[in-house]
A protein has these predicted regions:
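Conserved beta-strand edge residues that scaffold enzyme active sites
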Residues: 2, 76-77, 110
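Conserved acetyl-CoA-binding loop-helix of GNAT-fold acetyltransferases
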Residues: 38-41, 47-63
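Conserved acyl-donor/pantetheine-binding loop and adjacent beta-alpha core of acyl/acetyltransferases
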Residues: 3-38, 83-89
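Short coil/turn motifs at secondary-structure junctions
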Residues: 13-15, 44, 77
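C-terminal "cap" of GNAT-fold acetyltransferases
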Residues: 88-99, 105-123
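Conserved GNAT acetyl-CoA-binding A-motif
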Residues: 62-87
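Generic structural signal for helix capping and beta-alpha/helix-loop junctions
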Residues: 17, 79-80, 113
Length: 123
């Protein structure tokens, strides 16, 4: 019916402007590390496991691209209470955890409550 169901922006960290600090911290492996910098689902698709399905599909795609890892920078669900639906664009932690991503550290832009973290999946 032409409805947009999801949108994901993913690619090598070195191809994106805003994670330059993260790419610098990773050094040479940043070239083979992909970052999911945006991830959103249409309201009609939320709560149905779609985030996990998309993340699972990114794994073989990432291997085909030669990536060695995929990182994401989602918000903790507690951020929804504070910021309402304006924080959904990078995704929520539950979908990444369900897809096997592991929290590595607090996000460099996050506040002290760490409502946003870095999650990583090694390919």
């Amino acid at each position: 019916n032409g409805e947009l169901l999801a949108w994901v922006s993913v690619g090598p960290l070195v191809d994106f402007y805003w994670p330059w600090k993260r790419a610098g911290a990773l050094g040479e492996i940043a070239k083979s590390t992909a970052g999911i910098v945006c991830f959103t689902l249409a309201p009609s698709q939320r709560g149905k496991g779609q985030q996990r399905e998309i993340l699972e599909a990114l794994k073989p795609y990432g291997r085909e691209q030669g990536w060695t890892a995929i990182e994401a920078y989602p918000f903790d669900p507690s951020a929804l209470e504070k910021h309402k639906e304006h924080v959904i664009w990078p995704g929520l932690t539950k979908g990444f955890v369900d897809a096997g991503f592991k929290r590595t550290e607090a996000h460099w832009l996050s506040n002290p409550e760490a409502e946003r973290s870095i999650y990583r999946f090694e390919l």
